[in-house]
């Protein structure tokens, strides 16, 4: 079930007697969806994915939910440690093997702005595309973390030891405060290798919000006088560039639209 709105605005803010014009087009859309039901025999239907990160359809859920593993945490709400990460006795992070919803690929809204300037046969236009909301799993970031080449593995040019704000389970089954120090390498090895080939999925879920300069184009249209001695009635020459500049992204240089192993562009 889909519900949404789409708004479009076309305007010409500037038009001069010399022939200069500025045309502006703004397109805004917002959509929400809900899966009403699946066949009774199916509770989870895979739409794509790889290893321990999958795109599942579930009754009552949204189309395009990202499912994967998450950090193991204290789930007992009556515990004073509720919500804290559970580590090994050596202080290493651990992950739950059961997949849960860790993200949703669907954006909250989309916005496109096209601006076109024209003067005496010349026209210059650019398109800015914006996507707000939604998440994406980045296998690229996970691979860089595993090899130690990601910026997150060497904050401010240093790899200091760390003690996670977490608890571990002692021999009596009770939670104890973690005081064990681990190296940066040990931390990322645990995060990227636990629970499957893609590691703890939650660790590499990023906001898919992005703003980009989608297109730049420059064109020249020959007027009829120039073509009067030719068999052509109209000629327009131009150059165009796509995906020119990622203005804003949360994915450390990875394009949120670059997708592998999912049939839903998640």
Residue ranges: model-predicted function:
Residues 9-17, 22-24, 32, 119-121, ...:
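Outer-membrane beta-barrel proteins
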Residues 86-97, 186-202, 259-265:
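Flexible, solvent-exposed coil segments and beta strand-coil junctions
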Residues 246, 250-266:
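Predominantly the C-terminal beta-signal and adjacent terminal strand-loop region
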């Amino acid at each position: 079930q889909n519900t949404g709105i789409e708004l479009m605005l076309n305007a010409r803010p500037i038009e001069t007697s010399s022939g200069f014009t500025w045309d502006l087009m703004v397109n805004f859309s917002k959509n929400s969806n809900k899966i009403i039901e699946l066949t009774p025999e199916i509770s989870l239907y895979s739409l794509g994915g790889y290893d321990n990160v999958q795109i599942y359809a579930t009754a009552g859920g949204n189309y395009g939910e990202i499912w994967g593993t998450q950090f193991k945490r204290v789930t007992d709400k009556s515990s004073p440690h509720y919500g804290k990460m559970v580590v090994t006795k050596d202080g290493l992070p651990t992950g739950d093997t059961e997949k849960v919803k860790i993200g949703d690929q669907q954006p909250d809204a989309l916005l496109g702005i096209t601006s076109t300037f024209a003067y005496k046969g010349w026209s210059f236009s650019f398109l800015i595309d914006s996507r707000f909301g939604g998440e994406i799993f980045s296998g690229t970031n996970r691979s860089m973390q595993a090899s130690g080449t990601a910026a997150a593995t060497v904050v401010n040019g240093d790899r200091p030891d760390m003690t996670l704000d977490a608890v571990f389970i002692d021999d009596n089954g009770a939670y104890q405060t973690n005081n064990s120090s681990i190296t940066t390498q040990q931390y990322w090895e645990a995060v990227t290798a636990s629970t499957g080939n893609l590691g703890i999925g939650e660790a590499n879920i990023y906001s898919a919000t992005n703003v980009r300069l989608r297109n730049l184009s420059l064109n020249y249209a020959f007027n009829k006088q120039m073509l009067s001695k030719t068999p052509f009635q109209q000629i327009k020459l131009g150059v165009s560039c796509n995906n020119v500049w990622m203005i804003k992204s949360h994915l450390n240089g990875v394009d949120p639209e670059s997708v592998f192993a999912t049939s839903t562009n998640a």
